[in-house]
Structures are given as structure tokens and as C-alpha cells.
A protein has these predicted regions:
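Aromatic- and glycine-enriched beta-alpha-beta binding-site module
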Residues: 85, 89
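Alpha-helical metal-binding/catalytic segments enriched in His/Glu/Asp
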Residues: 80-84
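Extended beta-strand/beta-hairpin segments
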Residues: 1-78, 90-173
């Protein structure tokens, strides 16, 4: 339904009832800072089941880059928007709510004063997702799908819950 293979989701759900790790995907990403001024500042490969994609990032000029590629945060925000939109489409299909089209927008602002050493400020002011749906379903059904999306979207979960992290830095020999 609307480019969501519900039967595959149902198969995986059945598998998860027997194996709690069946729906776990491990990610391992690598990238590199480029020191040549002729190159975009950061790059890496992103692997997915059917291939790889080369990605580059470059800060805007006021953060020391030249804006030759999206910033790292732009990728984060696109990922959050894509995750929410994809989860919405998936939840709609699972609820048998057909979508003729779905468009999503995300608005937010970032305060970079902390990043440039001016003080300690919360950098993010809030995410405003807007989903525009063309569907023959009732508004009540659309709102039920939105509620399921808010409950099940991994990006929303990550915004609501502190995610543990570790960092390390190792000097090359």
C-alpha cells in the first residue's frame, strides 16, 4: 500500500515474537575530516542494503567552512524528517489508511553561539514537523496514524529520551 510492503512488516513482526533481536539493525559509520582547503571538510560512505552512497559535509562560512555541501546538522535534520515521514507512511499502511500523497516539512532554528565559544546556550529551539496528507480516510483516522507515528518513530523517541553515548580520541602513532 502506497509503497509500503505491509506483508514484509507482518513477517518481521511474526519473527520478532520468536526472536527479540530479529528487527535490530546495527550501524557502523566512518568518515574523515579533510585538511585540504580545496575539498569539502568532511566525507564518508553510507552503506545500505542495496548499495553505498558517498556523503560530504561542509560548515557554513561563519563556522569555518565554505558551505560547499550540507552541514552535518542538515543531514541530522533531514534524517529526523525522513524518519518521521517514513514512520507516518508505514503506520498508515499498517492501519489500512491509504495515502494518495504525503509531504512533510520540518522547521527549527539552531543557536551556534555555544559552538563558537560565546557561552553555554541550548543550541536547538524545537522541532516543528508538519505532515500534509492527501487521503480518502477521515481526519480521525489520520490523527490516529499521527498518534501512532508520535509513539513509534525512532527519531521522536531519541528526542524524548537521553541516548547513552561514549567518545574517545586516539593520537595516531
Amino acid at each position: 500500500m502506497h509503497n509500503v510492503r505491509v506483508e514484509k512488516i507482518n513477517e518481521k513482526a511474526d519473527e520478532c515474537r520468536q526472536n527479540q533481536n530479529a528487527a535490530t539493525i546495527e550501524f557502523k559509520l566512518e568518515g574523515e575530516w579533510r585538511t585540504s582547503k580545496d575539498e569539502k571538510q568532511f566525507g564518508g560512505q553510507l552503506s545500505f542494503p542495496n548499495g553505498e552512497l558517498a556523503l560530504d559535509a561542509d560548515f557554513p562560512s561563519f563556522l569555518g567552512g565554505e558551505g560547499r555541501a550540507p552541514s552535518a546538522l542538515a543531514y541530522c535534520f533531514f534524517g529526523a524528517m525522513s524518519c518521521y515521514g517514513s514512520t507516518f507512511a508505514t503506520q498508515a499502511a499498517m492501519a489500512n489508511v491509504n495515502l494518495k500523497s504525503l509531504k512533510i516539512s520540518l522547521s527549527l532554528s539552531v543557536d551556534f553561539r555555544g559552538a563558537i565559544g560565546i557561552g553555554t546556550f541550548p543550541p536547538l529551539k524545537g522541532f516543528d514537523f508538519k505532515v500534509h496528507v492527501d487521503s480518502s480516510a477521515s481526519n480521525d483516522d489520520i490523527q490516529k496514524v499521527k498518534k501512532l507515528t508520535d509513539e513509534r518513530c525512532p527519531a521522536i523517541w531519541a528526542m524524548k529520551n537521553p541516548v547513552p553515548f561514549t567518545t574517545s580520541a586516539v593520537k595516531a602513532l
